[in-house]
Amino acid sequence: MSRNGLGPVAGVDEAGRGACCGPISIAACILPDKPIQELAALTDSKKLSASTREKLMPLIKKHALAWSVIVISAQDIDRFGIQHANISGMRRAVAALGTQPGYVLTDAMKVPGFTVPYLPIIGGDASARCIAAASVLAKQTRDDIMTDMANDYPHYGLEIHKGYSTKIHMDAVRHHGASPEHRYSYANVAKAHQEWLHAADNDTTEGGA
């Protein structure tokens, strides 16, 4: 597209939309037009091993003409909603690029408010290098955040499931209650946390009887 006079093309993608704990991260990336051997493994970040993503992240930053990552907290997701957080984050990620693109590609996401033309591509993180690069930046950034968060909240196994709604995770919320980093606006978190509160109330009542 840049060769057709549209200017640099930025890919945008998110990580953590489907999680119930922790932030959502949104990345934007502009890569050179020419193939880059060190980035030959680039594809949808969900199809890459953790070790491959870790290796690719510094290489993407090394070769990118511009890149940015925006992190939106669980508290803001609860306040504004995940859809608003996602769209706002994508606009902010593109605006934060040191080189402004002439065109934006998203992974199937419709994003009103871009200042340049854009195109949602279904399966874009597997077919467009710039989206794949943004996908890796977003996911690896968020995975690192969740691994660090596990040190502060060790009861939930965040370093394993990265805040997604696994059985082990939701059982932990029922047993320990939700942490400040959980998304209380999500029905499964609210329900599990309420079950913990109910059990805690019963324990208090029995203990005081």
From Swiss-Prot:
Where a divalent metal cation binds, per the record, is at D13, E14, D107
Leading EC class:
hydrolase
Residue ranges of the RNase H type-2 domain? 7-198
Its UniProt entry gives the catalysed reaction(s) as: Endonucleolytic cleavage to 5'-phosphomonoester
Q: Which family does it belong to?
A: Belongs to the RNase HII family.
UniProt keywords, alphabetically: Cytoplasm, Endonuclease, Hydrolase, Manganese, Metal-binding, Nuclease
Q: Name one Pfam family in it.
A: RNase_HII
Q: How is the cofactor bound?
A: Manganese or magnesium. Binds 1 divalent metal ion per monomer in the absence of substrate. May bind a second metal ion after substrate binding.
Classify the source by domain of life. Bacteria
Name the PROSITE patterns on file.
Answer: RNASE_H_2
Q: Which cofactor does it need?
A: Mn(2+); Mg(2+)
Q: What is the lineage of its organism?
A: Bacteria, Bacillati, Actinomycetota, Actinomycetes, Mycobacteriales
Q: Where in the cell is it found?
A: Cytoplasm
Q: Which GO terms describe its biological process?
A: DNA replication, removal of RNA primer; mismatch repair
Q: According to its record, what are the GO cellular component terms?
A: cytoplasm; ribonuclease H2 complex
Chief place of localization? cytoplasm
> In the Enzyme Commission scheme, what number(s) does this protein have?
3.1.26.4
Give the function comment from the record.
Answer: Endonuclease that specifically degrades the RNA of RNA-DNA hybrids.
Gene3D superfamilies membership? Ribonuclease H-like superfamily/Ribonuclease H
Name of the featured protein: Ribonuclease HII
Gene designation: rnhB
A GO MF label: RNA-DNA hybrid ribonuclease activity
Residues spanning the membrane: none
